């Protein structure tokens, strides 16, 4: 395998501004990601004293997995105070989109770099967002059917989606296996398919909850790197979080005020508003089998789905006895994560690193230091077949990754068409426009006749446009094979109008190039970069 770096002209310049240490953005982070002193300062910061308990929670959480020596060593190092690089993601079906794996590679790459540069131990940690309850975001994935050059949506169907967190959801194993069968049916059958299906089936059989299956898959792929995993909704973890949840409850008005003020400042500085929330408590409570957002009104805490009010004392009593019933929202989750871990840097997707700018004051209010914030690596896979087509049509990969294929496709069709034919029709259109302008002069003052002429002109102009479009469509149909090639390029490099990593599933890459394609022995060594990486399997 090989990899190369390419620069894309991005519409959104946010990541470029971080790279350039833009002060308008930098004022909302606690550290400049581009300054070496930021890393040395984070690495030398005092630990929070929770590392022994946290390491034990992670060890217990991962006890149902087959761990490598490196993972066991990292758990031990974590308990001794080793700093971490951290990032997280929702538990997507069959691993979710490729960018989940790329986020993990970003965490691993940065932890290895800092360990080497500073001659210390920096541990890679992946945070599974198991407390989320929006099942529609994780219940599907896509498989690329090379024969039809088409992406097929694969969905796990259920009549009873979880009302609470996905980590407490136990999917129907037979239906999950049906989805797996459909997933592999869409893809090419390769020498790796049987082994892949066996691995996934074994995970479905061995584990019960949605996030445990996700955890097991990630561990299979990344255990050799020493990656540690934790579910944000883990019961033992929630017990450890208990005092900080209490602090959020007791200071919820200050937390909300600092968040709202911070958000207004980011907007005033020209940044896009990222977090939309009506709550003023920024915590969820599990009540009546539902994960419900707490709101403070009429001097009490209110649950809208259950239409219940609670006093602060009642809420704190629940926290004392059943802390696992509480969970964080988008505002408090990052702060909780950093309260737990001794973090050097948080690595997030483009939207995540944006919404962290809205939390700077919340970190201060809760006396937690915001770590360095970095964007994850962005990676596309260039298949040999794709490379061959690019060469055949003399196209640039970075152009398609960035803008899609439509302009190149239109250029190809026009090249096969008679430009004389198109020009003559365009000429007729211009001549007719002039003719109708003279007709309008003849009927000036008669509103009905003016409307009649304008309408008739419009009909004729439409007919000429139809003639050109239909002519080009016939050219397109005549070049059916080339059109399929263009579709292939689109679905592989710019699927559904965006980056490959946002749509494609990592199991597709494993099915095509081997179950160990993401392992240290096969995957090319990565260097952290703000630019786009192209991997050639």
Curated annotation (Swiss-Prot):
GO terms for molecular function: ligase activity. InterPro entries: Bacillithiol_biosynth_BshC (IPR011199), CC_BshC (IPR055399), Rossmann-like_BshC (IPR055398). It is an enzyme of class 6 (ligase). The keyword Ligase applies. It comes from the Bacteria. Keywords: Ligase. The keyword Ligase applies. Its EC number is 6.-.-.-. Pfam families: CC_BshC, Rossmann-like_BshC. Belongs to the BshC family. Involved in bacillithiol (BSH) biosynthesis. May catalyze the last step of the pathway, the addition of cysteine to glucosamine malate (GlcN-Mal) to generate BSH. This is Putative cysteine ligase BshC. It comes from Staphylococcus saprophyticus subsp. saprophyticus (strain ATCC 15305 / DSM 20229 / NCIMB 8711 / NCTC 7292 / S-41). The gene is bshC.
